[in-house]
């Protein structure tokens, strides 16, 4: 990440330092008079042993929030495992280092100990899990009675903004990251007196989230209404939503016994399941409209939507979600976790069986670690933005484990810890108050957020201002100054006539739009445990340590806003092309021409590219706050007549890096670094390590960095493979080599043009 400046450059930097009215739009802050806030980083999709993770709640919280020993600690954290049920007690700690007075180490037990062997089968509630049952505890019970109390205790003990969420197993689809925060972390937790002996009685609760899990998770077949087994003692939940007649529809599975829509099976299960999920969103909107969020996770992974199964999401399903609950369903995780896996993001060719036919993850793989829905300029994300929807981009870790390595090893052949590689930076308007679940969720909802991998950048201000002839004129320098002030203080803007991410700038026809971007590519090393030259960049003669990436360029992407699509219209629903109709055998794609009109926005294109040199070079500017160097850039969009949006992406990869980027700088398919098919591996890793860890050694943070290609890299194969027999870029090296950031959009709404209906 190091940038080298001459004395003259530093001196110059020091000088520089001086559509549809029927759609309900979410509530958002106006462009002026905002509550003060800062960009803070977090993660809302990760796992413990209560679902299918490898570690305890306590170990995960420590790994994720510690900024000294770890050291990639996040500013806020949502623990969110799968819905359904599980048999392991994630509240039991691994060792004495994690022991606390309320949750001490229990001899002979740990986070892989079953519920039956820790609390006893008789304490397991609901149907089927307790005495004589499977030993599995329903997630609603573990959230309500075990996981939430631990999270509240740790939040109070460590003074950290923590809360509990869920990776729902989605009816009709695969997974979504979500939470209902009602009841969680009341202000009284700030002054709670913590116990000095085992046990903690929380002041708040996760009852609303637990009820949602019971009512709507596809893997929850319990009909106990959240009660003690075989009794009416307990929650006595009723999932009826008086705001929706379909909430008790027998056609989609209503159970009078369970007072819920039960999971169904057989022909049409996907279609019925989707309708149930829409009801889940309506329930959230009606009962917890400002206290919940619902973000489809790794949504390309399970393939396209399957009306007779539970697979992926097509664009029409995202539209349905946003239409049903725009304050709740406002984005997606199109940059999945599992970044170190042998199939990056766990996206894979022929991953899924749909109707007996092996079917790719949508797009076949990721593209620079991002799913095709967002990575493809003009694709699904641009189609949604082209409607003027509040549909935002997020990234999360999906932490489970390190693959072939233990949880304390810095290497990985599967996952990264939350904050270690990917993080979402969100503007949280908490004023003088501490960070709290409500202000964090409010921040996510606004879309004033951006995501980066590998700490490629750690600050960003993205600003658009209107300029008119005469007294309303604005210079580039004046807008740059606004952005510099925001970026150097890790905050956003509060200026009339200007907007930032997740907002819209309302202008008169003919206005000039002045766009300024100021960001920081942080000096020094990132959190990679390697320090040898980046092998992907070595292909083009760039010698750059893999743990010191340098931002190569920033793309400004623009698209037109043409209004909301109408349900049932020909351009509302459309499936991304399957298998080789999109991703060909050689790893190239068929391009947007093969994508149906419903799933693309052909007006979207790269409008401007900034880099360190050339006609659109950024300018270094030294912060007056901490003396670090920021990069500033600006341009003008003249005489706008049509509503539109602009968004950003950037990478450490120049254009035309073999097997990484095309000639325009777009990310290529990650099949060339996915170790699940070694015949496709194409980038050799040749630096020999002089400190290669011996077999069985745990490589910890204290050991520093490995100075050559690690032994666990896959070996390329294939008679026609030019690097057959060589260690190839794969697993975590593929991820650390290839870094990207994505911003959310700024909308420009031109009077007498299309209304940007999704944003106030």
Predicted feature residues:
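Gram-negative bacterial Sec-dependent N-terminal signal peptides
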Residues: 1-31
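Extended, charged catalytic domains and RNA/DNA-binding interfaces, predominantly
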Residues: 31-760
């Amino acid at each position: 990440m190091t940038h080298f400046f001459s004395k003259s450059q530093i001196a110059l930097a020091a000088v520089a330092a001086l559509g549809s009215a029927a759609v309900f739009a979410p509530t958002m802050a106006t462009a002026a008079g905002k509550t003060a806030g800062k960009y803070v980083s977090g993660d809302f999709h990760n796992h413990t042993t209560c679902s299918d993770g490898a570690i305890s709640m306590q170990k995960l919280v420590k790994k994720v929030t510690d900024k000294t020993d770890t050291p990639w600690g996040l500013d806020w954290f949502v623990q969110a495992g799968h819905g359904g049920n599980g048999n392991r007690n994630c509240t039991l700690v691994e060792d004495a280092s994690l022991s606390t007075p309320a949750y001490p180490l229990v001899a002979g037990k740990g986070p892989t100990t079953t519920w039956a062997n820790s609390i006893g089968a008789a304490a397991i509630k609901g149907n089927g899990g307790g005495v004589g049952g499977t030993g599995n505890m329903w997630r609603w019970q573990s959230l309500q009675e075990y996981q939430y109390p631990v999270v509240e205790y740790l939040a109070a003990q460590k003074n950290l903004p923590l809360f509990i969420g869920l990776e729902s197993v989605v009816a009709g689809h695969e997974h979504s990251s979500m939470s209902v925060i009602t009841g969680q972390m009341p202000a009284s937790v700030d002054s709670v007196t913590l116990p000095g002996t085992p046990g903690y009685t929380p002041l708040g609760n996760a009852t609303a989230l637990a009820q949602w899990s019971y009512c709507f998770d596809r893997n929850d077949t319990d009909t106990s209404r959240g009660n003690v087994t075989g009794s009416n003692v307990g929650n006595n939940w009723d999932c009826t939503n008086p705001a929706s007649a379909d909430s008790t529809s027998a056609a989609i599975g209503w159970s009078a016994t369970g007072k819920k829509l039960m999971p169904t099976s057989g022909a049409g299960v996907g279609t019925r399941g989707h309708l149930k999920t829409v009801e889940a969103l309506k329930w959230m909107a009606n009962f917890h409209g400002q206290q919940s969020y619902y973000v489809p996770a790794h949504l390309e992974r399970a393939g396209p939507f399957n009306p007779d199964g539970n697979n992926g999401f097509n664009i029409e399903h995202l539209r349905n979600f946003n239409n049903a609950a725009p304050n709740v369903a406002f984005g997606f995780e199109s940059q999945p976790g599992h970044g170190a896996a042998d199939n990056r993001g766990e996206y894979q060719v022929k991953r899924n069986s749909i109707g007996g036919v092996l079917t790719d993850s949508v797009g076949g793989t990721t593209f620079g670690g991002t799913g095709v829905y967002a990575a493809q300029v003009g694709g699904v994300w641009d189609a949604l933005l082209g409607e003027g929807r509040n549909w935002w981009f997020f990234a999360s870790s999906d932490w489970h484990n390190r693959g072939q390595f233990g949880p304390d090893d810095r290497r990985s052949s599967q996952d990264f810890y939350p904050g270690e590689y990917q993080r979402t930076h969100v503007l949280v308007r908490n004023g003088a108050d501490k960070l709290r679940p409500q202000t964090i969720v409010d921040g996510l909802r606004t879309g004033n957020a951006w995501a980066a991998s590998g700490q490629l950048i750690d600050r960003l201000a993205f600003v658009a201002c209107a300029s008119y002839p005469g007294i309303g004129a604005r210079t580039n320098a004046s807008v740059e100054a606004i952005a510099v002030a925001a970026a150097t203080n890790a905050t956003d803007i509060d200026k009339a006539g200007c907007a930032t991410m997740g907002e819209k700038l309302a202008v008169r026809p003919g206005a000039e739009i002045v766009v300024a971007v100021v960001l920081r590519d942080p000096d020094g090393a990132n959190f990679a445990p390697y320090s040898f030259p980046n092998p992907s960049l070595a292909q083009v003669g760039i010698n750059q340590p893999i743990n010191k990436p340098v931002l190569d360029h920033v793309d400004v992407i623009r698209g037109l806003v043409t209004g909301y699509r109408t349900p049932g219209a020909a351009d509302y629903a459309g499936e991304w092309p399957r298998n080789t109709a999109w991703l060909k055998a050689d790893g190239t794609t068929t391009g947007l021409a093969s994508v149906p009109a419903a799933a693309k926005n052909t007006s979207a294109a790269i409008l401007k590219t900034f880099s360190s040199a050339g006609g659109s070079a950024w300018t270094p500017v030294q912060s007056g706050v901490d003396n670090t160097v920021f990069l500033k850039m600006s341009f003008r969009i003249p005489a706008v007549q049509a509503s539109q949006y602009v968004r950003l992406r950037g990478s450490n990869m120049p254009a035309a890096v073999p097997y990484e980027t095309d000639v325009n700088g777009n990310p290529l398919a990650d099949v060339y670094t996915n170790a699940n098919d070694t015949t496709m591996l194409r980038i050799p890793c040749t630096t020999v390590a002089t400190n290669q860890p011996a077999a069985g050694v745990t490589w910890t943070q204290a050991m520093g960095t490995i100075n050559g290609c690690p032994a666990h890299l896959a070996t390329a194969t294939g008679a026609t493979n030019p690097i057959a027999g060589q260690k190839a870029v794969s697993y975590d090296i593929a991820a650390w080599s290839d870094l990207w950031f994505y911003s959310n959009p700024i909308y420009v709404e031109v009077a007498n043009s299309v209304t940007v209906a999704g944003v106030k």
